[in-house]
Amino acid sequence: MDRMASSMKQVPNPLPKVLSRRGVGAGLEAAERESFERTQTVSINKAINTQEVAVKEKHARTCILGTHHEKGAQTFWSVVNRLPLSSNAVLCWKFCHVFHKLLRDGHPNVLKDSLRYRNELSDMSRMWGHLSEGYGQLCSIYLKLLRTKMEYHTKNPRFPGNLQMSDRQLDEAGESDVNNFFQLTVEMFDYLECELNLFQTVFNSLDMSRSVSVTAAGQCRLAPLIQVILDCSHLYDYTVKLLFKLHSCLPADTLQGHRDRFMEQFTKLKDLFYRSSNLQYFKRLIQIPQLPENPPNFLRASALSEHISPVVVIPAEASSPDSEPVLEKDDLMDMDASQQNLFDNKFDDIFGSSFSSDPFNFNSQNGVNKDEKDHLIERLYREISGLKAQLENMKTESQRVVLQLKGHVSELEADLAEQQHLRQQAADDCEFLRAELDELRRQREDTEKAQRSLSEIERKAQANEQRYSKLKEKYSELVQNHADLLRKNAEVTKQVSMARQAQVDLEREKKELEDSLERISDQGQRKTQEQLEVLESLKQELATSQRELQVLQGSLETSAQSEANWAAEFAELEKERDSLVSGAAHREEELSALRKELQDTQLKLASTEESMCQLAKDQRKMLLVGSRKAAEQVIQDALNQLEEPPLISCAGSADHLLSTVTSISSCIEQLEKSWSQYLACPEDISGLLHSITLLAHLTSDAIAHGATTCLRAPPEPADSLTEACKQYGRETLAYLASLEEEGSLENADSTAMRNCLSKIKAIGEELLPRGLDIKQEELGDLVDKEMAATSAAIETATARIEEMLSKSRAGDTGVKLEVNERILGCCTSLMQAIQVLIVASKDLQREIVESGRGTASPKEFYAKNSRWTEGLISASKAVGWGATVMVDAADLVVQGRGKFEELMVCSHEIAASTAQLVAASKVKADKDSPNLAQLQQASRGVNQATAGVVASTISGKSQIEETDNMDFSSMTLTQIKRQEMDSQVRVLELENELQKERQKLGELRKKHYELAGVAEGWEEGTEASPPTLQEVVTEKE
């Protein structure tokens, strides 16, 4: 502490000369270095002073530029070490502000040069912490923040001083190690905690009931918070991103402490940002972001996409108020005219309006008109007369002002007498205060005795502080070896708990000692400071009154002197009249010279305009030639790549090729229009260049799409398409070559290009998949037809089931009748459920069309969404077909000629088809739609009905098989052995057939997916759709 005080003592010279390490070099370099050090010394002393006002930005900026100039902070620290930072709190506060700016925006070596002063900053922080009022606590907390910032950037050198990093740099800082990210998050929490403590302490020290942000003292305390706001915005953003990354790698319970600490800091930061944004001081300097209403939910990974990084905006500086408005030419002309009228009026006032008929006007008597000089003389006489009148008015006005000032002086003399009376009272109070001051001095001597008795306590406190430093170093060691501590959790937990307990004991002892010292020192200083402040305020008021009296006396002397000045000005005006007469002739000579110079300038301007027009024409021609050559190069490269191997792995589609051909046709029309406009107006070349460039790129795309489409086409169409693409490329090159000369439109004929495009379009339409043969305008009608046909098929199937049930009741009895009734009843329930599903699907489709078509018709909506429409058509067909097949299978089962397995398979197929219909309907539906909920409920009803059909079929099959059990009672051993062998042979045959049938089923499904993909508009080259509900149920069985 003593070392810090001695190194920062004040020297008599307010601008100390910095001792720099100069080498023996050229005298010029030494002079430059000395000038730099002098400039830095002046700026640092102006930025860091004892006045309670905010640091001026220009002085801080000069300090920042100085660090970049010398690539370090040696000059800054050499000047700061001479300032009494430990004896003046305002000086220390402004030092912290400037040093914070240097750490953020200065040269990176500022941190390295400042590390040697870490201990001095810590000692100064502890010293200022003993003061509970004024800037003491503020300086203590700010110094702790700067110490934390230096330690953080020392441990994490990847973070710059201003904390501006990209997401990739943030990931690199953690080296892709979860332990590093864990430790980095803890350090960011500590860093942000120090920032928030300073923020909160500054606000608590201000009286928020008044407009403190517009006072100089309030701005002095609020100015450093701009740097704090910038740091807090970045730290909050990085903390959120790191916590999301940790939650993706570690369990949520492990990070519970991180989340609790983040919630606490989030609440504080949000409140401080809101309070800061309402202060008038910050509104004109910085735009403070507002945090979201609720904190991020780290347990939901998708919440990271909702996070918006807070951005602090510092507006550009306003224009200088010193700039003067520039008068326009018309305003100057009006001013000259008004002055001319003023001169005329003043001349008439002096010589009279009949001056032209004066007997001394010889020109008028002789019949000769007055020349310009006579007019000028007349105007000057009028001006002199006006000035005399103005002078008389000013004399009158000055006399009135003098009388007012005399009255004001009388009032001030009365105020002065009152002030003298108050001064006498203040002198009496001062005597009383001196008596009390003597008493305080005696008390102070007693206090010094008490302080000497506390020296032993301070030595003990220093010993305890040394123990605390050792424990803190041990704790830092433990944090750095975090990974080892995780493996030895039990032993380390015990050690950390012991260290924390010891630290708590030391902190308690240190706090008790600090409180006792603070109470003893404050009691003596508080009364002395209050009395001195009252005496100083009285002296300042007296000095202010004396200064006002001197100003008033000076204004009286100025008024008397102004009268003498007016007389001198009148004499000067008479002299100026004579000079104007001689100057008029000189101006006529200058005017003739200027006219001649104007003619020469006009000739030069005409020749320059002609040369510039020619130059612009040449540049436009060069630009057109360059654009055409670039377009030809793009097309030629596309033609050269037709045979290159990389295209083998790029399979294209015919619809992409046709889309590109359509775009080329439109581009050719636009190019012809642009060419016509260019021939009519050569200055407008932008549209022509754009059209040429667009045609080149579209042609390249068409050739590439044609080459990739050939890879999937049959050999003969592929060869034709390749040849057509080549011919189109050559025709395009020829067309572009015809644009080189500025001829008529006949030189650039696009007929050959259009023919090649027509040929490519015809081949592409032949290569389109069969599923796209339906005209888009017919899709809407086809959807309605297929849905109606499906409903009709369901109603027909229901009627047939009722008919079969009636026949079975009439012709069957016993177990067979029971089985048939159960199966047919479940089939009837299934058909009813399907009918409800179709009605719900129609309602949902109608809602989708009404909400999505806008002003278009339903047919136009279906045509616009053709692939979705084709999916609906396919699903409707599948439902109707499945219902018909199931009824046929049920009829055969009832008659005894069918298999129960066919009925189960048909049920599964109907369930899969209805699921496809539901999925196709849900694609464009609103998730909150009531019709969608009804459709999903109907789908669940279909699934339940399908399960009922399968269950009844299995039950009926088991009942019938129980009646057909074999009777082995009458068979011999040989017969049983024979039938056993036959059964084994049959089992082997059935297993072989089952294997072959499964392979056949796989091939059928593969082919079905391919055909379904083409029919429903699936993208070529994609995988097959997921298996249907029927396939899933079959595999489970």
Swiss-Prot record:
Name of the molecule in the record: Huntingtin-interacting protein 1
Tissue spec: Ubiquitously expressed with the highest level in brain. Expression is up-regulated in prostate and colon cancer.
Known outcome of mutating R1005E: Reduces AR-induced nuclear translocation
Disease tied to this protein: A chromosomal aberration involving HIP1 is found in a form of chronic myelomonocytic leukemia (CMML). Translocation t(5;7)(q33;q11.2) with PDGFRB. The chimeric HIP1-PDGFRB transcript results from an in-frame fusion of the two genes. The reciprocal PDGFRB-HIP1 transcript is not expressed.
Protein family membership: Belongs to the SLA2 family.
Annotated segments matching region Important for actin binding: 867-924
Keywords linked to the UniProt accession: Actin-binding, Activator, Apoptosis, Chromosomal rearrangement, Coiled coil, Cytoplasm, Cytoplasmic vesicle, Differentiation, Endocytosis, Membrane, Neurodegeneration, Nucleus, Phosphoprotein, Transcription, Transcription regulation
Predominant location: cytoplasm
Modification Phosphoserine occurs at: S338
Listed GO CC annotations: clathrin-coated vesicle; clathrin-coated vesicle membrane; cortical actin cytoskeleton; cytoplasm; cytoskeleton; cytosol; glutamatergic synapse; Golgi apparatus
Assembly mode: Homodimer. Binds actin. Binds HTT (via N-terminus). This interaction is restricted to the brain. Binds to IFT57. In normal conditions, it poorly interacts with IFT57, HIP1 being strongly associated with HTT. However, in mutant HTT proteins with a long poly-Gln region, interaction between HTT and HIP1 is inhibited, promoting the interaction between HIP1 and IFT57. Interacts with CLTB (via N-terminus). Interacts (via coiled coil domain) with AR. Interacts with AP2A1, AP2A2, CLTC and HIP1R. Interacts with GRIA1, GRIN2A and GRIN2B.
Gene expressing this chain: HIP1
Record domain I/LWEQ: where: 771-1012
Source species: Homo sapiens (Human)
Region pDED: start-end pairs: 410-491
Disordered: annotated span: 1017-1037
